[in-house]
Amino acid sequence: MKKISFFFLALMFSATGFSQQQLTADQLVKNQLPANFRNNLPVFVKWLDEDNVILRMAVAPDTIVTNYVLDIPAGKFTKATKEQLAGTLPPFKSAYVRGGKLFYKAGTSEKQVTFDAAEVKNPVFSPDSQYIAFTKANDLYTYHIATGKESRLTFDGTFTTLNGFASWVYWEEIFGRATRFRAFWWSPDSKTIAYMRFDESMVPMFPIYNSDGQNGSLEETRYPKAGAKNPEVKVGFVGPTGGNTIWADFNAKDDQYFGWPVWRKDGSSLLVQWINRGQDSLKVYDVNPTNGSKKLMYEENQKTWVDLEDGAGGRFHFLEKQDAFILASDKTGWNHLYLHKNDGTLMNPITSGNYSVLDIELIDEVGGWIYFIAKGKESSARTDFYKVRFDGKQLTRLTFGDYNHSAIRLSPAGFYFVTTHSNASTPSRMTLVNNQGKIVRELGDSKGAAMDKYQLAKTELIRIKSADGLFELPALVTWPLNFVPGKKYPMLVSMYGGPNAGTVTDSWNWSANRQLYAQEGLIQVAFDHRASGHFGKAGVNYMHRNLGYWEMQDYMQMARWFIKNGQADSTRICITGFSYGGYISCYALTYGADVFTHAMAGGSVVDWRLYDSHYTEKFMDTPQENPEGYKSSNVLTHIDKYKGVLQIVHGTMDDNVHMQNSLQLISALQDRGKQFEFMLYPGGRHGWGGEKGIHFNNLKTRFVYQHLLKKEIPAGLVK
């Protein structure tokens, strides 16, 4: 734990110098900073090749920002041409949906493909660009570009039978929202389409009310809540012109989930990820598309859970020059890379240790290196870039300094990379580095020449020991400007709080609003608990069957630490978050109400029985299997402990965390005569923008000034 004495605090906050000016409230409110206070970093556009990269920037003596090509060996900038920006992939082809109809474009020639009333979704070219596959009315179709023929591949699509179009819980929790419900996959040889068929008829329907118009309307979604029936899923194979579907050898009646499947590079088989409903036994099968037979290729079991969602197939990386693949797994308590033969046999671990591999950026089979991004090897609050041999030897850090390297852009063959890096006290910089870790060129510094003339609030990363003494928990603290040791300040804690979803990084994050709050005398804290990912899967496992408990133990310990040190006013301790962060905020003013006095909760889960099956049961098992866990994690269980001031906010059409959660909390508070603040955003989903987004920001600002700062809001701050 990093201990801070009154003497050190006095020294720390007096070291800024008497000659520095203070940014005015008006400058911060309007975000109109002095000249040369901040510089815009170059914007990475793309690599042209190993020696040339396009950056959007201003190159002296020109002050106009435009696209430049940096010739790395020559060290010279030239303005990028249209051809360089456009790329080298003529003739350009695209398939897109406009007004629900499918259009195909080659060069400048556009053609409408579909004309019926059914809305087309997710057009995808075959790898040989001869076909476009898409769904409409919950059936799968193809369009043959050369002949203009449309082929219908499935014929049983209904409101509850979906072919090639994912059921809601798969889209939200397994495949990811970026997939846009797509549930079909071309084989590499363009001869087969694998797809999933979802039967939702047994899944409970959840109604969402739309208040627009004279009579309003209902939007109904098949939404499986914890312990409820899931959709039945089949995996099938069909040719691009139709014919009988070959079904994979799985029993659709089993209580199971399927992950994002991955074709082998030769199209000979499809790797299908299967997991039981309890989500503690992952099996990967090689499925033959010609007859549907399956062969177990990989199996992983954990006492808590195995993550099925993997960024749309990111668990596997097949090699080109040998019959092997790289698999990512957190089975040891940390996410690492493993080299397997194509039959699934483990050859060797590639990485190991108390850190987590986040992404593979390049597999260089010729040079014999794997380039990857990892978190936690240097510090749990930093990410860095590394390379390692296939046998796990010669692990080399390529990034540098005590910085968080937040954006890595590697050249196509891995000779160079561009990194954007900073820490809590150092503004962001952009640097060009080679694959030996040597800095080649500084590309930009966001710190302007005038920044040092101004007194800024100090932000630092500290560690707070957990109450059980097992963890050094990270907190990013922005202290009040002109901090006075011994004076107690109100404190605002911002967090998300979900499993393996930490928000604390040792990085620079300029915010005019944060500087204004610091001038007003507010301690601002971002804090991550033991299960936020800083301590690997081993730390996240604490949440198993017990959501809310360990998170709140750590949040309360953090708040008590500031109170005990005489820095925080125990009567003004506020916590705020959205979604899972909203849940924690509500839990803080019930279970944790002896420590927290105020909370702003948005889009909150209140009772985990009201959230979806896949996410909830991964951590909690079903309500039938874990009744005590669901009871203790329920905000309503602790409602009689409620005290303080709670602001509850929800979008009326939230299809993820239903407004039902907030309404049940409100009902319980009203039944007990408890006071609270409440705001609805009509039509709002799980988040909202536009004028309602501005209103939401103003709402939170008013809360901070009224309840924490207890002063008038500066003119112009509320828009």
Residue ranges and their predicted role:
Residues L41-K46, D51-P61, N67, F77-T81, ...:
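Non-catalytic accessory segments flanking enzyme active sites
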Residues M205, W260, S406-K719:
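Serine-hydrolase catalytic core recognition
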